[in-house]
Amino acid sequence: MTTSFYFLLVALGLLLYVCQSSFGNQHTRNSDTPKHRCGSELADQYVQLCHGKRNDAGKKRGRASPLWQRQGFLSMLKAKRNEAFFLQRDGRGIVEVCCDNPCTVATLMTFCH
């Protein structure tokens, strides 16, 4: 009986050790550690951090109306192409910044308004 008791005690100790080591890392990890976020994880994190607000570069630059209305463009296609150029974030989108490369929460929040 003592052999089976020790075996049970060792098995229970190992089980507790495994549970503690796997769940304990969640609280010790720095939330601002660079991490790859792709797909639904990236989208969920974005919505959670930004609360549905998005980074509108036009508002940041004080544009009250679309570029084609303010500049009197003759071609709507040309106006939209130029406006899309200004809305890019240094040519890098959220997927390139946070999925292709690891990014921090602070970097991800730069895409919020």
UniProtKB/Swiss-Prot annotation:
Its main location: secreted. Heterodimer of A and B chains; disulfide-linked. One of its GO terms (molecular function) is toxin activity. InterPro entries: Insulin-like, Insulin-like_sf, Insulin_CS, Insulin_family. Gene3D superfamilies: Insulin-like. Pfam families: Insulin (PF00049). It is found in: Secreted. Venom insulins constitute about 1/25 of the total venom of C.geographus. Residues 22-29, 52-92 form a propeptide. Coiled coil: none annotated. One of its GO terms (biological process) is glucose metabolic process. Keywords: Amidation, Carbohydrate metabolism, Cleavage on pair of basic residues, Disulfide bond, Gamma-carboxyglutamic acid, Glucose metabolism, Hormone, Hydroxylation, Secreted, Signal, Toxin. Residues 1-21 form the signal peptide. This is Con-Ins G3b. Expressed by the venom gland. The modification 4-hydroxyproline is found at P34, P102. The modification 4-carboxyglutamate is found at E41, E96. It is noteworthy that in this dimer, in contrast to Con-Ins G1, the chain B is amidated and not the chain A. Disulfide bonds join C38-C99, C50-C112, C98-C103. Belongs to the insulin family. This venom insulin, from a fish-hunting cone snail, facilitates prey capture by rapidly inducing hypoglycemic shock. It is one of the smallest known insulin found in nature and lacks the C-terminal segment of the B chain that, in human insulin, mediates engagement of the insulin receptor (INSR) and assembly of the hormone's hexameric storage form. Despite lacking this segment, it both binds and activates human insulin receptor (long isoform (HIR-B)) with only a 10-fold lower potency. The modification Histidine amide is found at H51. GO terms for cellular component: extracellular region.
